């Protein structure tokens, strides 16, 4: 299943049905009076957060959604049936934005949460509604009210307890594959990870969900590399694990590069609890390791954990620190179910311009 975290869709609720002008016609009853029924109410456009989804790919191929129109009223005081509502299913963590892409309309945070995005139009009154002592035979009825229509943006942010950040090739995917059942693509070149990955981690009996996002490079907030758009998927995390490659030229500069991109992105990412780890310690000699550790300690103003995703050294300590921050709150079932789909190697699918 391809990963798509943003989509633009058009929605329109149903128009209300028209009221009916009709009169009672029976033998020997000369003035039967009005009996035109009311029109039915138009269907709503409803968005529902469901379990088991972790992509908006369905909205890449269909962008127009219209609810059913209410039926017209009929004679003999028969009211029109209401139009059928349409329900759009989205993953938990999806946000609805107005067409300007900035105005937040709703944020889905729980399975089963529903939001009426566009209400159907009310049905028009039939002529029986207008009968009064002074108007015994009204010959007019109301048309149904039109439904609402609008363009919206759906933006999904994965729900995870902890997030992995770092430069490309910092060893994030290797770390995730070692501590969970996730199977991300791993290779010795930058940007191996093209879309976020999720894994369920068990640290001393405490489970939490860990998210790995594509690596950041200098200028990512300006669109360099894969940009910083995937940082939205760690906005909901309670803690960040910042991995720095011990084999890079300068661990301190590598750390500051990522921190600068987090600050430029915003979203309070720099205010989150951060655990710093120097990775790939098995690939450098002791003297170089000490230099890199000291550089990273000065830049981060905290002592980094020394780990190796390949050998497993220091990994348990990092997981315990993450679990201590995450706490004992249970992992959402949505995040667990997303792991299998998130581990696929399908490329990220860019949103396509809506047709029509």
Swiss-Prot record:
<dbReference type="InterPro" id="IPR036726">
    <property type="entry name" value="GTP1_OBG_dom_sf"/>
</dbReference>
<feature type="domain" description="Obg">
    <location>
        <begin position="1"/>
        <end position="159"/>
    </location>
</feature>
<keyword id="KW-0479">Metal-binding</keyword>
<dbReference type="GO" id="GO:0005737">
    <property type="term" value="C:cytoplasm"/>
</dbReference>
<keyword id="KW-0963">Cytoplasm</keyword>
<dbReference type="InterPro" id="IPR031167">
    <property type="entry name" value="G_OBG"/>
</dbReference>
<dbReference type="InterPro" id="IPR027417">
    <property type="entry name" value="P-loop_NTPase"/>
</dbReference>
<dbReference type="InterPro" id="IPR006073">
    <property type="entry name" value="GTP-bd"/>
</dbReference>
<feature type="domain" description="OBG-type G">
    <location>
        <begin position="160"/>
        <end position="327"/>
    </location>
</feature>
<keyword id="KW-0342">GTP-binding</keyword>
<dbReference type="Pfam" id="PF01018">
    <property type="entry name" value="GTP1_OBG"/>
</dbReference>
<dbReference type="GO" id="GO:0042254">
    <property type="term" value="P:ribosome biogenesis"/>
</dbReference>
<dbReference type="GO" id="GO:0003924">
    <property type="term" value="F:GTPase activity"/>
</dbReference>
<comment type="subunit">
    <text>Monomer.</text>
</comment>
<feature type="binding site">
    <location>
        <begin position="279"/>
        <end position="282"/>
    </location>
    <ligand>
        <name>GTP</name>
    </ligand>
</feature>
<keyword id="KW-0378">Hydrolase</keyword>
<feature type="region of interest" description="Disordered">
    <location>
        <begin position="327"/>
        <end position="356"/>
    </location>
</feature>
<dbReference type="GO" id="GO:0005525">
    <property type="term" value="F:GTP binding"/>
</dbReference>
<feature type="binding site">
    <location>
        <position position="193"/>
    </location>
    <ligand>
        <name>Mg(2+)</name>
    </ligand>
</feature>
<dbReference type="InterPro" id="IPR045086">
    <property type="entry name" value="OBG_GTPase"/>
</dbReference>
<dbReference type="Pfam" id="PF01926">
    <property type="entry name" value="MMR_HSR1"/>
</dbReference>
<comment type="function">
    <text>An essential GTPase which binds GTP, GDP and possibly (p)ppGpp with moderate affinity, with high nucleotide exchange rates and a fairly low GTP hydrolysis rate. Plays a role in control of the cell cycle, stress response, ribosome biogenesis and in those bacteria that undergo differentiation, in morphogenesis control.</text>
</comment>
<dbReference type="GO" id="GO:0000287">
    <property type="term" value="F:magnesium ion binding"/>
</dbReference>
<dbReference type="InterPro" id="IPR006169">
    <property type="entry name" value="GTP1_OBG_dom"/>
</dbReference>
<comment type="similarity">
    <text>Belongs to the TRAFAC class OBG-HflX-like GTPase superfamily. OBG GTPase family.</text>
</comment>
<keyword id="KW-0460">Magnesium</keyword>
<dbReference type="InterPro" id="IPR014100">
    <property type="entry name" value="GTP-bd_Obg/CgtA"/>
</dbReference>
<feature type="binding site">
    <location>
        <begin position="166"/>
        <end position="173"/>
    </location>
    <ligand>
        <name>GTP</name>
    </ligand>
</feature>
<feature type="binding site">
    <location>
        <begin position="212"/>
        <end position="215"/>
    </location>
    <ligand>
        <name>GTP</name>
    </ligand>
</feature>
<feature type="binding site">
    <location>
        <begin position="308"/>
        <end position="310"/>
    </location>
    <ligand>
        <name>GTP</name>
    </ligand>
</feature>
<feature type="binding site">
    <location>
        <position position="173"/>
    </location>
    <ligand>
        <name>Mg(2+)</name>
    </ligand>
</feature>
<keyword id="KW-0547">Nucleotide-binding</keyword>
<dbReference type="InterPro" id="IPR006074">
    <property type="entry name" value="GTP1-OBG_CS"/>
</dbReference>
<feature type="binding site">
    <location>
        <begin position="191"/>
        <end position="195"/>
    </location>
    <ligand>
        <name>GTP</name>
    </ligand>
</feature>
<dbReference type="InterPro" id="IPR005225">
    <property type="entry name" value="Small_GTP-bd"/>
</dbReference>
<protein>
    <recommendedName>
        <fullName>GTPase Obg</fullName>
        <ecNumber>3.6.5.-</ecNumber>
    </recommendedName>
</protein>
